[in-house]
Amino acid sequence: MDEYSLQPARIADARRLAVMSQELVEAGLRPAWSASRITWHMRHPESIVLVARQDSSIAGFAIMRYGDDVAHLNLLAVDPAHRRRGVARRIMTWLEETALTAGTFIIGLELRATNEAAHAFYATMGYRELGRVSGYYQGIEQAIRMARDVRTGRDAVPGLKQPAP
């Protein structure tokens, strides 16, 4: 993998992350992830906003919120110029190891049902489909709900409770 460093996002990164979310995750939807919402997560003690940097540019990022029993991956995005270089895998591995260390053993997430590449990626990371939610994305698009138990790396927990995003 190219040289990428993982680090907590800085407040100055919030606008760039909001643009990345709008272009890479929320395309075709009303933007839900504003710079102020991302900044809130940066400041919240139960959230992490993690960026992968190559030199001074942001190659990818994730936002995850920790609950007592379950962590919720809110966003994961990698700039197209940095895809297929292990950036998403490295971010997810870091988040999973951190959750395990914190005693939060389940990570849950939702993704757009039309995002076949993301679905395949999460499946290779050991996430299992728990179900589908019609109209999850602003009443427009179906979501796939997935989860992984990071203790075993392979088993999702049926009936998973999701913390508030």
Kindly give the residue locations of the regions a language model identified:
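Acetyl-CoA-dependent GNAT
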Residues: 4, 8-83, 92-98, 102, ...
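Conserved G/P- and acidic residue-centered "switch" motifs that form tight phosphate/ATP-binding loops
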Residues: 86
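Short amphipathic helical patch at the helix-1/turn junction of helix-turn-helix
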Residues: 78, 112-113
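Short glycine/proline-centered loop/turn elements that form peptide/ligand docking sites
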Residues: 92, 115-118, 135-140
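Conserved catalytic-core motifs of GNAT/GCN5-like acyltransferases
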Residues: 108-111, 123, 128-145
